[in-house]
Structures are given as C-alpha cells and as structure tokens.
Amino acid sequence: MFQTGGLIVFYGLLAQTMAQFGGLPVPLDQTLPLNVNPALPLSPTGLAGSLTNALSNGLLSGGLLGILENLPLLDILKPGGGTSGGLLGGLLGKVTSVIPGLNNIIDIKVTDPQLLELGLVQSPDGHRLYVTIPLGIKLQVNTPLVGASLLRLAVKLDITAEILAVRDKQERIHLVLGDCTHSPGSLQISLLDGLGPLPIQGLLDSLTGILNKVLPELVQGNVCPLVNEVLRGLDITLVHDIVNMLIHGLQFVIKV
C-alpha cells in the first residue's frame, strides 16, 4: 500500500526540482522568441519628435533668446548703419515736420523673445528634412522727446533650416545644415500700442517697411549659425537613426 507520507515527500521534491530548473536558460532550439536587439530604435513618429525636441532644447540652451534680444537693430537703422544715410533718416523725414525733434529717437529695444513650437516636414524623396523655427519678439521704439515708448510692435518670423545626410571622405555619414533662410512671407508685424497724439499710422507704415527689408536677413544671419552648432551637437544615437532613414529615403515624419 502506497504511503500517504511518501506521496507528500515525492511531490515536495518534484516541486523543488521544477523550481530549480525554472531559473536555467532556455535551450536555443525551443520556439520562445529571443531578444537579439534589446535597444530598438524609436518609432517613426517618436524619432521625429525626438529630433524637434533636441533641436528646440539645443537652441534654447545655446542662447537663442539672448541672440534675439541683442539684435543690433539700431546700428542698422541709424545714419551710417549699413545703408546709405541710414534707414532712420528716411523714416523720420516723413514725420518730423509734424513732430519736431523726432529725429532724437535713440533706442529700438527688443523684448520678450520667444521660440515657438518647431515644425518638421520631409522631402517627397525622403532624403531631406525641413525644420521650421518660428520666432517671436516685441519691438519698443523709444524717444526722449516724450520720455516714453512711441510704438510697441509684435513681430513673428519663421526660419527654415534644411537638414541633409552627407558622406565625408572617410565614408562617415553626418547630418549637416543645408539652406538656412527666413521663410518668404512669414514676417508678421502688428501694433501693440502707441501714443495717441502722434501720427502713429504713418510712423508704423514707414517702420514696417524698413523692418521688412532688414529684419529677416538680420535674424537669419544671427540664428542660422546657432542651428548649425546645435545640429553638430546632437546625440549620436539619434543622428544614426535619422541618417539611416534619410539615406534609404524612408518616410518617418508622419503628417496628422
């Protein structure tokens, strides 16, 4: 007759043995899936988001807002500042007959610089990226004549940066900056406030015309070198994943 105590001991030993074997490696010929690549690349949408986040963070940490705040607008507008006779001369000539002494404008101050959400599109052939960098600033035009601000303007401008994957002489592939320019038609200038007694509309129209001529290239010339610097400092893993997609023309910027 089989002893109950022996049965208990048998099952106890069996359970202990199975527990021990549970910690052993699974043989390679079994059909369980193997994790041969634990560090999987980001999904396409995740890759695009990681790129825009990295660029945005790099621009901010690289001093973009300070660059915008210190744009040398007054140096360009005042007499002798980069144009024949200076642009302020033409601007002030239209209103000084109404307001004597307005030629004493001494300051055009940039305030509240902003970097808005970056945009990203991919070329139809899949080999290029175009990053839209939307920027915002406020301009304050001051004069000692009235001891206050004449005008406050809100300005928005987009910079578009082309990103390419290129192969160097050592056959290494890098992300590089292609064309970097202001987006045509993206400059927006709006009046925030101005002193009522002054001929604001005439001053605004003249100043807007001048800013349309000089501001886009001024911003472009100061921001694009920083974009190039940020691009060279991107995380190597992120760069590798993006280069792989661009070289093979694979679409990973998903439009929703």
Swiss-Prot record:
Signal peptide range: 1-19
Keywords tagged on the record: Antibiotic, Antimicrobial, Disulfide bond, Glycoprotein, Immunity, Innate immunity, Lipid-binding, Secreted, Signal
UniProt-annotated location(s): Secreted
Protein name per its UniProtKB record: BPI fold-containing family A member 1
Keyword Nucleotide-binding in record: no
Tissue expression pattern: Highly expressed in lung, upper airways and nasopharyngeal regions, including trachea and nasal epithelium (at protein level). Specifically expressed in the secretory ducts and submucosal glands of tracheobronchial tissues (at protein level). Also expressed in the eye where it is detected in lacrimal gland, eyelid, conjunctiva and cornea (at protein level). Specifically localizes to epithelial cell layers in cornea, eyelid (basal epithelium) and conjunctiva (at protein level). Detected within acinar cells and ducts in the lacrimal and Meibomian glands (at protein level).
GO-annotated molecular function: lipid binding
Post-translational changes noted in the entry: May be N-glycosylated.
Superkingdom of origin organism: Eukaryota
UniProt source species: Homo sapiens (Human)
Subunit structure: Monomer. Interacts (via N-terminus) with SCNN1B, a subunit of the heterotrimeric epithelial sodium channel (ENaC); this inhibits proteolytic activation of ENaC.
Record family assignment: Belongs to the BPI/LBP/Plunc superfamily. Plunc family.
Lineage: Eukaryota, Metazoa, Chordata, Craniata, Vertebrata
Record-level GO cellular component terms: extracellular region; extracellular space
Encoding gene, per UniProt annotation: BPIFA1
Function: Lipid-binding protein which shows high specificity for the surfactant phospholipid dipalmitoylphosphatidylcholine (DPPC). Plays a role in the innate immune responses of the upper airways. Reduces the surface tension in secretions from airway epithelia and inhibits the formation of biofilm by pathogenic Gram-negative bacteria, such as P.aeruginosa and K.pneumoniae. Negatively regulates proteolytic cleavage of SCNN1G, an event that is required for activation of the epithelial sodium channel (ENaC), and thereby contributes to airway surface liquid homeostasis and proper clearance of mucus.
Induction (UniProt): Up-regulated in response to all-trans retinoic acid (ATRA). Up-regulated in tear fluid of patients suffering from dry eye disease. Up-regulated in response to the pro-inflammatory cytokines IL1B and TNF, and the bacteria E.coli and P.aeruginosa.
GO biological process assignments: antibacterial humoral response; antimicrobial humoral immune response mediated by antimicrobial peptide; defense response to virus; immune response in nasopharyngeal-associated lymphoid tissue; innate immune response; multicellular organismal-level water homeostasis; negative regulation of single-species biofilm formation in or on host organism; regulation of sodium ion transmembrane transport
Disulfide bonds: 180-224
Pfam families: LBP_BPI_CETP
Chain intervals for the UniProt region annotation (Important for surfactant activity and antibacterial properties): 87-92
